[in-house]
Amino acid sequence: MPYQAIINIILIFGAAIAVIVVSKKLKMAPAIGFILTGLIWSAVAPTALKSNDELKLLSEFGIVFLLFMVGLEFSPSKVGRLVRAMFVGGSVQAILTIGVTLGFALMGLISFVQAILFGFIIIQSSTAIALKIYQDRGEIDSPHAETSIGISLFQDISTVLLLILIPFLGANLTAAGNSAFIVAGRGFLILAACAAIAYYFLPVILRWVVLTGIRELVVLLALFFCLGFATLSQALGFSMALGAFMCGLLLNRSEYHPQIIAETASFRDVFLSLFFISIGLGYNWQFAVEHFLPVVLLTVAVMSAKTVILFISTRLVGFPFRTSLLAGVGISNIGEFGFIIMIAALPYGLITDYQYQMLGNAAIYSMLLTPFLIVGISKLTLRFGAKSLTEKKRGDTFKTRPKDCHSWLRAGRTASFSSAQVFRNSLQNHRS
């Protein structure tokens, strides 16, 4: 890595520390702080960092680890608890949203392939931002938070399915569409075959590694398979994120996946922070100034439409008015998975640079607005509506806040110690 690239990364992390501290004081989610860091640097040094290939590579690792952790943490029991919000609410949201975008295709404004793609991009939400706000407000166990999580699980699955379909959708738009379609199909079969083989051998290898008693080997093995599957997926014409997700699912069936999650969390957080920073770095200030009004109108239209659609979706499932409204507002933004889809679609010509800039800017604005909307709508519904079940049980605890501002440090240390204890217990159980 060139010396200048290292200097750039040091400067970015230094700026991120300052911005995150300020964001914490303002009660903002860390993801917003990272995006603001990128926005500041894109204004201060518009050319020094945007062309930095090493930084882009590190941010791609953030995407890889994000999908890896999604696969690793995918829990059938969690799906069972949230099945109503996940499959019914999530599918209704997807159908209604794609129905709206298909209307633009019928008017001849975009192609039908783009209508489907844009529909999937728009339904994605940043639960990292919403859940952080819910956690800070003591609402993490509230009905609207659980509803948001359920719908987000459906969105995660839809992202993975779309990452599989993008090469096939792109093949239809190329001159050599049939041959490209065959190549994509062959690549998917090879990837599926490798996954089937790994399905049987990964748990055996992981068990052997745990029996060695060397914790570092668990981390190295997880990183090796994660990056290995990601690289294989890209070599076969798919995204690295898809391969990482498949690897996470394969390791998920192992009895040791809790300590894999704990041991690799620090890697994920570092690279994921770079991904959010890169979102801000990609902000084109000149484009934003020249197209300010259209971007603002698009942001308002998307957030309003998503709130209404999510409200309708959750009400049809049977959730009460306040839960549906707060869930709709909380995930009305276009989240990080929307960027992942757009980045994957760009090389295939499924989305133009202009469309990427418009949707990307709207996504950034929507994520920055989400905390204020959640707080505002929550206060509004408390003033004019009935309290939620969580509030009735706890009283007005949503206004209370942790007294210890360093509680997250203790939580991190506790997670680390718990991971070590889980590792030792697993090792003792196998040796006994």
Give a label for each model feature.
Residues M1-A411, S416-R424, R431:
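Transmembrane helical cores of multi-pass secondary ion antiporters/exchangers
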